[in-house]
Amino acid sequence: MPLSLYNTLTRHQEPFEPLEPGHVKMYCCGVTVYDYCHLGHARSYIVWDVVRRYLQWSGYQVRYVQNFTDIDDKILNRARQENSTMQAVSDRFIQAYHEDMQRLNILLADVYPKATDVIPEIIQLIQTLVDQGYAYAVDGDVYYAVDRFPDYGKLSGRQLEQMQAGASGRVDDTEPKKRHPLDFALWKAAKSEELSVYQPWDSPWGKGRPGWHIECSAMVRKELGHTIDIHCGGMDLIFPHHENEIAQSEAATRADLAHYWLHNGFVNIQGEKMSKSLGNFKTIRAFLNSGVDPMMLRLFVLQAHYRKPIDFSDETITAAQHSWQTLQEGLRFGYDYGQQLRWEDYQDSSFGDPACMRIPDSGAEIERFRAAMDDDLNTASAIAVLFELAKELRREGNLISHAGQPQLDPQELRSIWQTLVCLAQVLGLEVSPETEVTADDGLSEAEIEDLIQQRQAARKAKNYAEGDRIRNELKTKGITLIDQKDGSTKWIRD
């Protein structure tokens, strides 16, 4: 079955057919850089990172573009509050964005255009819309006339009279200069109170700065051309942002902006939509700095279908931690047991690198993984395949620790492990030789070994009661100790 994707534009799941065979042009709306990224951003960029990875794994050459909105009222307001400048604020949070995404193992985009990089292209695009009658200038501002574009509303499925102005929080629907409440700004005249934080740009309509929506239209056009394959973002961007992008770009070029529009679902916190007003707003860095493994967060996001809402709660995070431990143990299998199984390349520097592994193009697990991903990127079903492989490796690891040898042939185990590692990398789930497995209760390998040493010391001192207490404590936490004939102690997870 070929890859099929749910297209917001058509409201149907459709076979994916790129404009140019073997090549994909993909644009993702990036962040407005006035604050640290939150968990909603984490979900969105993890999802689109996986889409890109899967397309590349499937043989496509993907050009992936993701912008930064570095001109916006929110940035200007923060700059004024901090007695800083728009550029200083945006530079700081662009750097913070990259730090957060690196921790989440999100691949770098091919290019990160900024709105400030494309001011000439923005002005040219606005002029085209004015010349063609889709936009009008009033006192230094330029507005898009939504009633001039017959297809306005086709992405969100709304009629013009059903829409609510100001849905983005960036539009003043009471502005008397506008002909229609839904008309939106393409160019904003400079205001005296803003001049201390940014230098306005010259334009045919006077000094000012671009509006939010026109920035993306100009960046898509410059980096990818008039028509692209995939345009993606969060569901909150469907209206008005993506609706307005379509209106601008398609009015100017007379061509479809994108063939496939993909949108990920919302993030809820303890059952409520995450928002600053409710006080349940969580940033990525604060969440990860609390001790959460970034790969666990990534796994948590991918265990739900990308179009459905997900709920961050104590219960769901705990469940995800348990799931990551299981998968982590499977991914570490080669590092933990490769030498004991006498895999010939164990000492090679490339050992464990998925790019250097040779796995078959077909096989039951690979075909099931591919079928899941081809079905509108069903990562939940794809991860179920990974868990089956990881649990099998976990059982074999317990046998090696307990009996000294596995049940399966070492080369068969090697094939299972390499398949798991390679498929997990398609989802961006990775470990390294230095990765330390953390038990469900929070005990690290080092902590377990320390307790074992305490037990051995107690037994050496003939304090058998203390030794039994430590053994029982570990047992309640899912750790079984196996005393060896030579006096050493091995441990396995139950």
Swiss-Prot record:
GO terms for cellular component: cytosol. GO terms for molecular function: ATP binding; cysteine-tRNA ligase activity; zinc ion binding. Its cofactor is Zn(2+). Its EC number is 6.1.1.16. ATP binds at K276. A motif ('KMSKS' region) lies at residues 273-277. It catalyses: tRNA(Cys) + L-cysteine + ATP = L-cysteinyl-tRNA(Cys) + AMP + diphosphate. The keyword Nucleotide-binding applies. Zn(2+) binds at C29, C216, H241, E245. Keywords: Aminoacyl-tRNA synthetase, ATP-binding, Cytoplasm, Ligase, Metal-binding, Nucleotide-binding, Protein biosynthesis, Zinc. It comes from the Bacteria. One of its GO terms (biological process) is cysteinyl-tRNA aminoacylation. SUPFAM superfamilies: Anticodon-binding domain of a subclass of class I aminoacyl-tRNA synthetases (SSF47323), Nucleotidylyl transferase (SSF52374). It is an enzyme of class 6 (ligase). A motif ('HIGH' region) lies at residues 31-41. It is found in: Cytoplasm. The keyword Methyltransferase does not apply. Binds 1 zinc ion per subunit. Gene3D superfamilies: Cysteine-tRNA ligase, C-terminal anti-codon recognition domain (1.20.120.1910), HUPs (3.40.50.620). Belongs to the class-I aminoacyl-tRNA synthetase family. Monomer. This is Cysteine--tRNA ligase. It comes from Cyanothece sp. (strain PCC 7425 / ATCC 29141).
